[in-house]
Amino acid sequence: MSVFFYLFVLVFGLQATIHCAPHNSSEGKVTTCHLPQQNATLYKMPSINADFAFSLYRRLSVENPDLNIFFSPVSISVALAMLSFGSGSSTQTQILEVLGFNLTDTPVTELQQGFQHLICSLNFPKNELELQMGNAVFIGQQLKPLAKFLDDVKTLYETEVFSTDFSNVSAAQHKINSYVEKQTKGKIVGLIQGLKLNIIMILVNYIHFRAQWANPFRVSKTEESSNFSVDKSTTVQVPMMHQLEQYYHYVDMELNCTVLQMDYSENALALFVLPKEGHMEWVEAAMSSKTLKKWNYLLQKGWVELFVPKFSISATYDLGSTLQKMGMRDAFAESADFPGITEDSGLKLSYAFHKAVLHIGEEGTKEGASPEVGSLDQQEVPPLHPVIRLDRAFLLMILEKRTRSVLFLGKLVNPTKQ
């Protein structure tokens, strides 16, 4: 059976020059999910979050041309929403507008309830799927956060809060990195390097996802060396997994791409989008929540001979400049307003650091063995069936079915570049 790991860490640094008493915090966790009553925002959130994901993707694609792209949209949305509820005036308005929300027709209370339910639903225990999202706030010992802020981040965001001595830079850096390494089960080590002085608060957001294909690949069918076209003049060799199976798929003649859905064993799916050669930018520009809904409606199940590269991908971004270009300017400026976090002035966002890691392949069960599955009854397979080879740049998405959340979004340009 196939095992996949998807890991994400987002770090925000807030800077200020303040003097106040230290505060000790305790841990709090949400243990049950309650569906908010009469909350229209809850039902709009999947579409709004998806549109934010594609807007951010397009920015990252422009800033990183011809490179692999990979990030966790839902985790970034959660972290920014958490930050917005501690902000005020234009700082809050800009953060929420970047996320796609308008406070004129969307009450803050509904947003809080919506994100609380999203986090709780994603973290709700599942039998064959490991999915855990979490947050941690590392607060300088000299900062006195408001009691309401501490209560909200625990209740709404299942957040751990740690009092931290940022005057001892190396010790603070070690404390944060150790936490991240533990929460990501050792997959992200030494996330923060060269931590600077005058950091007052750091928000860490992570997501861990591990699942098995509903129809696992056979290791013996993997081609150890197969061509993958990076561009017109560059071809690399990659292991190529191979399977003849029934998949939901669709050829979008309007967008000139082929869409294929691969289900995980429980409540999650992977969506691969293969544009025709020369049409990647066209597809990227058209990606939206409406596009996802269209594909979901038009996907048809049938036999497909599928070739998928076995690859690892990781990407690291400083989202500060990207978010500012998207309209979130005040949070990084001297005019930043965070009255919901502390009564002290001078608090502003210094950077937004994001890292995501993905491995996809047929490595096997948790013990590392990948059992062979029985042969297909060839009489069931029609003599004519489509062949889909993901042997050039393609888009990939990992979606959680219950909340319709885009957990991960990316583009594989070169599978040999991690």
From Swiss-Prot:
GO terms for molecular function: serine-type endopeptidase inhibitor activity. It comes from the Eukaryota. It is found in: Secreted. Coiled coil: none annotated. Its main location: secreted. Keywords: Glycoprotein, Secreted, Signal. SMART domains: SERPIN (SM00093). The keyword Chloroplast does not apply. The keyword Signal applies. Thyroxine binds at N296, K401. InterPro entries: Serpin_dom, Serpin_fam, Serpin_sf, Serpin_sf_1, Serpin_sf_2. Glycans are attached at N24, N39, N102, N168, N227, N256. GO terms for cellular component: extracellular space. Residues 1-20 form the signal peptide. Major thyroid hormone transport protein in serum. Belongs to the serpin family. This is Thyroxine-binding globulin. It comes from Mus musculus (Mouse).
